[in-house]
Amino acid sequence: MKSKQIIIMFLSFIILFAISCKNDDKTGSSGYSVPKATGDKATDLTTQAEYSGTLNRTAHEGPSDTGLTSMEFQLFIENNKVKGGALGAFAGGADFPGTQVYKSGSEYSAYSSYNSADGSYVDEGDVKEYIKFTISGNTVNVIEYIASVTYDGGYKDTYSGTLTKTTSAGS
């Protein structure tokens, strides 16, 4: 009888240990994987230009859902940097210099991240944005735009679409 009690206690311990080791982090310190920009720093996007258009959602992860299956999107390019986006990691304030664009072949990409609590730009903040795009004439083909947050349940949305040039320097 004593050996049965020991076995039951041992199994109970294993179950409790397994439950306590389960990673169920709801603090926002983890999150969804968002790619970083790749390639060399872009040197050919020196002219100021603004592009706008509609991006359509192609993927969604996470318990929280913005419900945005499409969105109006603006992208500002100047001095090899981008501003714009939907969540603010690319937006910044009036004195925000923009996010560095990188180039690999004919594709451009940019990544930015910030902490929503204090607005500081850090490498692994709770708000992340990534964009990969090509430019042909007055058109930007957004291969993927990824927006991710880790607060309020968190989510990661991926969008793609086409943007058209709306202004440039001197217009």
Positions of the model-derived regions?
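Bacterial Sec-dependent N-terminal signal peptides
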Residues: 16-47, 167-169
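Contiguous, well-ordered beta-strand patches that form the walls/edges
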Residues: 83-137
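N-terminal glycine/threonine-rich, aromatic-flanked beta-hairpin/loop signature
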Residues: 61-105, 142-149
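Short, exposed beta-strand-loop hairpins at the edges of beta-sheets
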Residues: 138-158
